[in-house]
């Protein structure tokens, strides 16, 4: 396989997504600390809850379910979307509720906001930030000629496999690399909104607000999987933005209710 050049616009998209993934959480942390008077601890509690509930517990359940269900689940886009949405909502919102109910002290609006910044922020850094760093490193290797030199030292089969694995960096539309950053902005706003909903559910002892948090999380994850199979990444992000807008309005309404 011939190694192409990674367009400058693609690298710009990678850098944009990288900056968003780290600058947004840091900016929100500073804002919540300086402007809202939040404590720092809820940010790191949010980071920890995401790690434990998603990367450890949810991932373990996925391994078991996929092993048992096999293609019966992964072979159906609808079933896979429903399953993915349910698991994401169950683990993340349950973790959010437990953290806010028992760990975040005092449980007030500034600390709920700070928790959401941590939960959504660490997700951005780990999922998009790390991938962006890898993409940028690969692009630099390709454009500098380092990759071609390394491939020349491999046998034909390994060289072809390596080039194929990296080919997306020069064959993917440049705009697509900006999508990761846009997606993270939407996701962080969603996590802030869901954190406020869960906070209000605890403050007001309102099951409705908690159920809304579960529902919005399920809907956005399920729709993202479904639409990814039939539509462009920008259609997926548009729908995600609309659903997130609904979550923002619901959180605002919950704050206005007594």
Q: Over which residues does each language-model region extend?
A:
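Hydrophobic alpha-helical segments at protein termini of multi-pass membrane proteins
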Residues: 1-258
């Amino acid at each position: 396989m011939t190694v192409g050049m990674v367009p400058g616009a693609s690298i710009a998209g990678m850098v944009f997504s990288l900056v968003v993934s780290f600058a947004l959480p840091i900016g929100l942390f500073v804002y919540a600390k300086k402007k809202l008077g939040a404590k720092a601890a809820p940010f790191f509690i949010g980071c920890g809850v995401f790690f434990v509930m998603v990367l450890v517990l949810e991932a373990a359940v996925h391994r078991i379910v996929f092993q048992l269900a096999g293609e019966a689940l992964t072979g159906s886009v609808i079933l896979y979307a429903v399953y993915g949405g349910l698991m994401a909502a169950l683990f993340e919102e349950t973790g959010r509720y437990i953290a806010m109910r028992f760990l975040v002290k005092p449980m007030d609006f500034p600390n709920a906001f700070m928790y959401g910044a941590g939960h959504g922020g660490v997700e951005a850094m780990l999922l998009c930030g790390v991938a962006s760093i890898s993409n940028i490193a690969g692009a630099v290797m390709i454009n500098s000629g380092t990759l071609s030199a390394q491939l020349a030292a491999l046998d034909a089969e390994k060289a072809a496999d390596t080039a194929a694995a990296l080919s997306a960096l020069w064959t993917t539309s440049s705009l697509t690399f900006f999508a990761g950053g846009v997606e993270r902005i939407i996701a962080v706003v969603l996590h802030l909104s869901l954190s406020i909903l869960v906070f209000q559910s605890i403050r007001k002892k309102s099951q409705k607000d908690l159920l809304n948090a579960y529902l919005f999380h399920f809907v956005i994850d399920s729709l993202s999987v479904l639409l990814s199979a039939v539509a462009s990444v920008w259609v997926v992000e548009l729908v995600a933005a609309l659903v997130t807008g609904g979550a923002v309005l619901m959180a605002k309404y919950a704050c206005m209710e007594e």
